From Swiss-Prot:
This is 4Fe-4S ferredoxin FdxA. Binds 2 [4Fe-4S] clusters. SUPFAM superfamilies: 4Fe-4S ferredoxins. The gene is fdxA. It comes from Gottschalkia acidurici (strain ATCC 7906 / DSM 604 / BCRC 14475 / CIP 104303 / KCTC 5404 / NCIMB 10678 / 9a). [4Fe-4S] cluster 2 binds at C19, C38, C41, C44. Its cofactor is [4Fe-4S] cluster. GO terms for cellular component: cytoplasm. The keyword Coiled coil does not apply. It comes from the Bacteria.
């Protein structure tokens, strides 16, 4: 299961550089995770100050 970024995202960008497979990019109102690229490692969740990345 891939991670998704929920509506709690404050677009701080902390998660993007932590992703080892570059699955995270900035979206219109929050960051988004490409489910096909995500390897479910949880690195994004570990650095998010608002716990926005959650397992889908």
């Amino acid at each position: 299961m891939a991670y998704v970024i929920n509506e709690a995202c404050i677009s701080c960008g902390a998660c993007e550089p932590e992703c080892p497979v570059n699955a995270i990019s900035s979206g219109d109102d929050r960051y988004v995770i490409d489910a096909d690229t995500c390897i479910d490692c949880g690195a994004c969740a570990g650095v998010c100050p608002v716990d926005a990345p959650v397992q889908a």
